[in-house]
Amino acid sequence: MAGSPFTTALLSAWTLSTVAVGYPNGPWYQTPLGPDVVRDPTRYPGAIEKTVDYVVVGGGASGLTVAARLSEDPSVTVAIVEAGSFYQEVSNASVVPGYAADYLTGHIPPELDWGFNTEPQAGADGRVKHYTNAKTLGGNSAFNLMAYMTTSVGAMQKWAEEVDDDSWTYANVTRYFQKSLNFTGIDPHKRRANSTPELNPADVGYGGPLDVTYPNYAQPFSSWVKKAFDQVGMRPVGGFMSGELFGSSWVLDTINHTDGQRASSAKTFLEPILHRRENLFLYNRTLAERVLFDADRTATGVQASRGKTVFNLTATKEVVLTAGGLMTPQLLQVSGVGNAALLQELRIPVVLDAPQVGQQMEDHISFGVAHRVDVETNSALKYAGPRQHAVEEFNEAQAGILSSPGPDFGGFADIPSELRNFSASTHADLAGLPKDWPEGFFISFPVDVGFPQDGYNYAMIVCTLMTPMSRGHISIRSPSMHDRPVIDPRWLTSTSDVEIAVAAVRRIRQYLQMPVLERNVLVGGEVAPGPEVQTFAEIHDYLKKNFNSMSHPACTCRMGKKGDPDAVVDPKGRVFGVKNLRIADASVFRFLPPGLPLGVVYMVAEKIADDIKHDQKHGAGEEGLRTEF
């Protein structure tokens, strides 16, 4: 593929394999918790052995949700084990919404990222790619683009049918979506009138820990993209919160309406309760080394380390794994639950032969088409004048371009008939999905992902592929959690993924050619992929060099019904074949449903936390105790 200077910059930005040392251009708008919290020995026990009711491994979105819910009962003791600490101690890049997209270009302080790389990827021309995975309280809710939405009714119906449990239908999980939420409407004095979202108040939640709102700044480019989507007949829907995705909407974000900061799980679920609950203990900067089992395959606790000190945390009721789609299967395997042949090769004592652990990995990828535009975008933040103005506006009023993560408007759609030159295998793959499952999420993307520093503004329309059929896996290379897992997502190795992605690039071009954009916003010709990239092979080559993982690893400890050979957990998150061990993160997803997954992550955590409470009160039953696969 012929490469323009812009394409070269885009390639280097979106496929970075290392992380930057820091973020140089941030407004120094810090809110550290202070020594009264960070050094409190009762809330931060250090490397001290302790016995509690529940040990929760992983302090991300799911883990902090589970820990907060379990510790609502003052008679129940909960320990959280998290390898990272408070991101506010390191940088404000996870505080200011306008810096969210910079994580896509590698502006990740190394203290906050695990530094994982994939195996060489055939779908990326054999390259090794960095895989962002948060090492901080809040997990990926401290790194992501902050979008919150639910999924489709049909997707959850498919989930419920495949796990043989109607409690997973959309109607039955709606209360768990809403339970977390504290929705606040827009500030009309800060957000433009022509970007007022339409949202049914009954579709959101109020009074929960997790703040969701619309940013105080609407991107000008997004207002024009909305007009283009209107021109092609994409109808408005209410915030992607009703179980219906097809259509366009302004996107809800996890932002605190009062201070304008990112509302991560650390800020919303943990920080308000950490001082007030004497039954909650945070082991930050502490690595879970392995799950401990007795001779009866009952999880009894976790071996952990802080620095060079190794110690045990004992769980009298359950161990709950919430380390995410990459590290939960890694932890299971180093603990002896996995493929027996691999475990024996690595001299790990086999607790349970479970070869499905780490398999069935799904992920979302994204890619886009870029233009120079005649409106302000986040690319202006490269220059001192606009940057200083943005800093002042955010610090003084939590307004302006830094109050928004950037990608604030999008639409879910299928590829239109004139572009559907798909193979029989692709048609067969799509036929297995519910009718309300869109093929792509097309997003206004007015943020800097390697744009030239030439004084102009640039933007993209990006597609996140909603129908990933490529399947990867997570494995281990040693018996130690200190070593990186084997990460092989196998992106773009499915024929259907390639064909739909190529068609999606062509569909983005159609959107950008709508008169309302061409006449009012776009300046000059397409800069990436570039007008010379036209054939299927040329677009495919562009995709291989420029797609980006959304870092949504899921399904690696898949949920299923009794007798499902691919299932690791039952519909209540209980690990088959062992006792007192549950998983409550994205690794248990039956599949990666349409929509962006943050809302589903919180929902799953809320639901499984409720299941834990119910089982402890009424008895667990036998579903999670199956010992053969």
Curated annotation (Swiss-Prot):
EC numbers, comma separated: 1.1.-.-
Annotated signal peptide: 1-22
Residues involved in FAD binding: A61, S62, E82, A83, N144, L145, M146, A147, A586, P597, L598
A UniProt-annotated Pfam family: GMC_oxred_N
Cofactor(s) the record lists: FAD
Keyword Metal-binding (UniProt): no
Enzyme class: oxidoreductase
SUPFAM superfamilies: FAD-linked reductases, C-terminal domain, FAD/NAD(P)-binding domain
InterPro entries: FAD/NAD-bd_sf, GMC_OxRdtase, GMC_OxRdtase_N, GMC_OxRtase_C
Role played: The subsequent chain release by Dieckmann condensation (DKC) could be catalyzed by the TE domain present at the C-terminus of pyvA and/or the alpha/beta hydrolase pyvD, installing the tetramic acid moiety.
Protein family membership: Belongs to the GMC oxidoreductase family.
Quaternary context: Homodimer.
Protein name: Dehydrogenase pyvF
Gene transcribed to yield this protein: pyvF
